[in-house]
């Protein structure tokens, strides 16, 4: 297979349009279509479905896309590794964070550490759900991702980082330093969607006690959740680091959830079938160092060894 055709194919899938991909690649659309046709002929498979709204990959196209991204990324890493011989590490390292994670406590110390140790490395931070971040890892669109516990995913390796207790956050009628699930069942709740780790843990606790949560809104965005809590319409369940950040933003209260106590494990996820680039490996080591630093250890979370 021709390297350039793989590059064209990946760009088409990323953009979802032959016309727009041709413009970005500075190639005539008929010529780009011919490159795709040649690739399909080499593989004896249809790779793209063409519709009025654009193009989407077939099942065979999805498989090729995953492998093509890995090939292109490895080539980029090889070029960079050769270029960096005898030079300071440089390039981009992409890190994903799931909403509500300890990102607010980790990212700034990490950025400062990278800036001090490897000033030529540029960090790209991306926030999305754990499921989306894992998919981006598999497709080699991210170097690593920090997410809350998730079911094992083929093509992704996980390394346990720490545990955080869950807290209730609000602005009206503080229940005290701690609150049990029976009391929470009487409150209006803002929760993330039902596939998130936080939601699964809350639903499990309510189900064991045959209680029904009064969910008045499902919110993924921390910014939107902050506005919702500030309005006084309801309360939210968050890990401690996110709870402290939101509580400070809305001048609210936070209560530790007891009976039962609830916690979530945070993990560092990596592509299972690809080696990290030298710069990504360096950033990973800094990330682990930041999490285990004395400043972080003072926070109310449990490091996982």
From Swiss-Prot:
The keyword Repeat does not apply. PROSITE patterns: HTH_LYSR. It comes from the Bacteria. Residues 18-37 bind DNA. One of its GO terms (molecular function) is DNA binding. Residues 1-58 form the HTH lysR-type domain. Keywords: Activator, DNA-binding, Nitrate assimilation, Repressor, Transcription, Transcription regulation. The keyword Transcription regulation applies. Belongs to the LysR transcriptional regulatory family. Transcriptional activator for the hut, put and ure operons and repressor for the gdh and gltB operons in response to nitrogen limitation. Negative regulator of its own expression. This is Nitrogen assimilation regulatory protein nac. It comes from Escherichia coli (strain K12). The gene is nac.
């Amino acid at each position: 297979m021709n390297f350039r055709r793989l590059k064209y194919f990946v760009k088409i899938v990323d953009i979802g349009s032959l016309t727009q991909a041709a413009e970005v690649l500075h190639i005539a659309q008929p010529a780009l279509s011919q490159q795709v046709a040649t690739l399909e002929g080499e593989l004896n498979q249809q790779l793209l479905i063409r519709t009025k709204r654009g193009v989407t990959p077939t099942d065979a196209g999805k498989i090729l896309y995953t492998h093509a991204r890995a090939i292109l990324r490895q080539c980029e890493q090889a070029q960079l590794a050769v270029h960096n011989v005898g030079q300071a590490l440089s390039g981009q390292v992409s890190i994903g964070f799931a909403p509500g994670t300890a990102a607010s406590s980790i990212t700034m110390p990490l950025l400062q550490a990278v800036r001090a140790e490897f000033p030529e490395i540029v960090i790209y931070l991306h926030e999305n759900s754990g499921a989306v971040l894992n998919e981006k890892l598999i497709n080699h669109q991210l170097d690593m991702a920090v997410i809350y516990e998730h079911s094992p995913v083929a093509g992704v390796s996980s390394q346990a980082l720490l545990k955080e207790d869950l807290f209730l956050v609000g602005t009206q009628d503080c229940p005290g330093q701690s609150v049990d699930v029976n009391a929470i069942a009487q409150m209006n709740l803002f929760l993330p969607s039902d596939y998130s780790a936080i939601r699964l843990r809350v639903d499990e606790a309510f189900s064991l006690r045959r209680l029904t949560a009064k969910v008045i809104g499902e919110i993924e965005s921390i910014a939107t959740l902050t506005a919702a809590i500030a309005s006084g319409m309801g309360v939210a369940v968050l890990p401690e680091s996110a709870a402290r950040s939101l509580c400070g933003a809305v001048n609210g209260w936070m209560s530790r959830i007891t009976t039962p106590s609830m916690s979530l494990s945070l993990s560092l996820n990596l592509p299972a079938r690809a080696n990290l680039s030298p710069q990504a490996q360096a950033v990973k080591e800094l990330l682990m160092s930041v999490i285990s630093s004395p400043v972080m250890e003072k926070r109310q979370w449990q490091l996982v060894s």
